[in-house]
A protein has these predicted regions:
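Structured loops at beta-to-helix junctions and adjacent beta-edge loops in soluble globular domains
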Residues: 36, 55-57, 230, 289, ...
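Active-site-proximal helices and loops of the catalytic beta/alpha 8
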Residues: 157-166, 174-175, 180-191, 245-247, ...
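Aromatic- and acidic-residue-enriched segments that line the glycan-binding/catalytic groove
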Residues: 47, 63-77, 132-146, 173-216, ...
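Active-site-adjacent "subsite" loops/lids of carbohydrate-active enzymes
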Residues: 83, 181-252, 258, 262
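Alpha-helical packing segments of well-folded alpha/beta enzyme cores
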Residues: 102, 106-109, 152, 156, ...
Length: 332
């Protein structure tokens, strides 16, 4: 109290944090306290790093021979061509035209990347997929043959490390491709996928309303059946098992994962991923694609725990990007 009447202490008047202010009347400006667990540390190599993003198909083509190319893919002879973005005769955008960039091409460009001062590469998905963007994973254990082989990936990581460059992979774990060994809607893979039989070992990875054609998808894209992250078999395969996808590629040379659509993965899954990643490589980074403010994010009715210290190391920080673009273009 002051002079017999109550005063309040709260956020600074400009609401920009720092030292607070005394309020003698009216409501205190709202404020937020962000806390995290004691001992929470982020990887040293990622702090302050300029991260160079590579879309593998369009970065650099080494000229190395391609092998085991699945059917249905077309290649541009001219590197300067426009991508085939228009719908086909059936009204579908297939994303199956390729320019042939590969892992060996990235390795050959190490001097260029080193000259730029790049300490970390973030690569869009590299696993076998039907599309050129590769966000419709077909096989998590295999590098897409257009990009090279698993051995090529190990060589790239080793060569990059010699130049002081780390590599972060894109982890598309909230959904797979319908054209995958796990779902196998088009029977391009041997064995029995979730779409082929109720007895498939993968059928409980997904959620079917009416089997087999009515299944939960990412944003209703039928090419991207959504994962049931509560399924223990999926968790073992992807995260908790000794040979899990999260662990295997870190052991093979990756320095972290950027998690596609992190909002689609529950907090307990993210905690398991963090534990698995740090077990495989204590200095690995776990980065989330979160479009809003990560410390206030609510998804599917749940306030997310991204920043509490036992899930993500960091996020893509699109709000900062939006603010910078607005400032540079003269918008408020």
């Amino acid at each position: 109290q002051k002079d017999g009447h109550a005063v309040r202490y709260g956020n600074a008047y400009d609401q920009l944090g720092g030292e607070g202010a005394v309020y003698e009347s009216g409501d205190v400006s709202s404020y937020q306290i962000t806390v995290y667990k004691p001992g929470f540390k982020t990887p040293g190599f990622f702090q302050g790093a300029n991260v160079y993003q590579i879309f593998p198909d369009r970065f650099y083509k080494s000229g190395a021979a391609k092998g085991e190319i699945p059917t249905g893919r077309t290649f541009h002879e001219n590197w300067q061509d426009q991508p085939d973005w228009a719908p086909n005769a059936q009204g579908k955008i297939t994303n199956t035209d390729f320019f042939g960039g590969d892992l060996q091409g990235i390795r050959e460009k190490r001097p260029y990347l080193k000259e730029l001062g790049v300490p970390c590469l973030y690569m869009n998905p590299i696993f076998e997929s039907h599309s050129n963007h590769r966000y419709d994973t077909g096989d998590y254990r295999k590098v897409d043959p257009i990009l090279g082989t698993n051995t090529d990936f190990k060589k790239l990581c080793a060569a990059a490390a010699d130049c002081g460059i780390r590599i972060v992979l894109d982890g598309v774990f909230a959904h797979t491709g319908a054209d995958s060994r796990y779902f196998n809607r088009f029977r391009h893979y041997p064995g029995c996928g979730a779409y082929n039989s109720r007895s498939s070992v993968y059928v409980r990875w997904y959620s079917f309303a009416h089997y087999p054609d009515d299944y939960k998808c990412w944003w209703d894209f039928k090419d991207l059946p959504a994962i049931n992250a509560a399924n223990p078999d999926w968790r073992k395969y992807m995260i908790t098992g000794e040979r899990s996808i999260v662990r295997t590629w870190l052991r093979d040379g990756a320095s972290g994962w950027r998690l596609d659509v992190a909002d689609e993965l529950p907090d307990d899954v993210l905690r398991d991923m963090r534990a698995a990643a740090k077990a495989a490589n204590p200095d690995s980074v776990l980065l989330g694609e979160v479009w809003e403010d990560a410390v206030t994010k609510v998804s599917y009715g749940e306030r997310r725990q991204y920043a509490l210290g036992d899930a993500l190391d960091s996020v893509m920080n699109y709000p900062l990007r939006d603010a910078l673009v607005a400032f540079l273009t003269g918008r408020s």
